[in-house]
Amino acid sequence: MSYPEKAFEAFAVGDRAMFSKTITDADLLLFAAVSGDQYPLHVDETYAKTTRFGARIAHGMLSASLLSATNGLLLGRPGGISLAQTLRFLKPVYVGDTLEAITEVVEILPERRRLRCRTTVTNQRGELVIEGEALEQKDPA
């Protein structure tokens, strides 16, 4: 990934960053190991088949973590920090789904070098699986 240099003053409403990834079986297992979330819906196919989902689904936070990539891509260099992130999980994500995460600037708050952003994650069918809002603070040059 490339993180281009971008000054705070160069941001405009509508600026966006995108990252896409296909969710794999290994992603679920690695995320379960790293996060400690070993809930059977994510790691046990036999159990997951008995649920309303019919198969294992990705952890919500695994899918949401793609927004960390888009937030960083949007900020560029010098970077910044995420101050807040709200999320609504709208649809399940299955192994094999290809997700597209987007962070888009909706408001510029110059007094504290902050950006209010809309964040979305959609699947390969164009269905919105996560929506939310991020508050990012850009570092000075």
Language-model segments: which ranges?
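HotDog/MaoC-like acyl-thioester-processing domains
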Residues: S2-V13, P92-A141
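A generic structural signal for short beta-strands and their flanking turns/coil linkers
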Residues: V13-D15, F19, D27, D37-Y39, ...
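Short, intrinsically disordered, mixed-charge
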Residues: A33-D37, G72-G76, Q124
